[in-house]
Amino acid sequence: TLEEMWEIIDTSEQTQKHCMMMENVNYGREELLFLNMCRKKVIGDLLHAEAAYIHDLRDQMDDVKKRGEGLWRPYHLAKRNGNLYPTHGLGPVAQYMNLSRSEDQFNSIVSYSTPAIGRNLYAKEKHKEDHKWNKIDFKGGDLNTSIIKTNLGRTIMVQWDETSPRPYSRLNLIQGTKGTLAGFPTRVALQGGVPGATEDHHSWATGEQLETLYEKYDHPMYKRLEAKAKKMGGHGGMDFIMLYRMVECLIKGIPLDQNVYEGCFWSSVSQLSEIS
């Protein structure tokens, strides 16, 4: 809740202890590439972002006998209606925009959910009539879309869908006055074209066409840790980079990449979307 987030912030300040949301996707190669390109103004002034957590997790409803998310996650969908997991998509784009660390931050939000149909259908199709999932009327809409406006007038679309039959995506789109960067799959469109790949911004540079951009704009931290990350793994290495970086910051006494304010800042979208 919003009240509990303030308790976390107050406790961190009073005890002078770090509190970092371990949002691993901020350390993916694509996300670090986009962060570096945004910092270098490759796509100009930032205007709009699109973030999401789109992941069909209906099969977790089958894992009720295991010690896993299937034991508790569906209960949130049963009672709550909004964006129940905003940070996985929002974390990276919020950092691209440097929100909460500059003069800009969230100003307002409006949120809409589709009807809640998919979970009820899945329960009927996969489980017996007297199964516990068939005794619940799921309230959470299959897809939630929230639009955030920042103090500087920039916009962010955040979506959440753990029910629909569609491919995984976090969208990861950031749009500026000189181009757009987007994920799933990684693609780039620049005013005047991507050198050696496209002639103008009317087509995306993808796949092998992005090699020159990786060579030029790969984040210094990724370059430094790439070999170790590939060896250690963890969601493609992002888990390792996140853990390595957190320990590195603590040992060297430098600020963490995500602080307590950002963790609560991103998380607040969940309850605010429900209120909206």
What are these regions (language model features)?
Residues 140, 158-169:
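Glycine-rich phosphate/pyrophosphate-binding beta-alpha loops
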Residues 13-20, 25-137, 246:
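Predominantly a Rossmann-like dinucleotide-binding segment in NAD(P)-dependent oxidoreductases
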Residues 146-152, 176:
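Active-site beta-strand termini and strand-to-loop segments that position acidic
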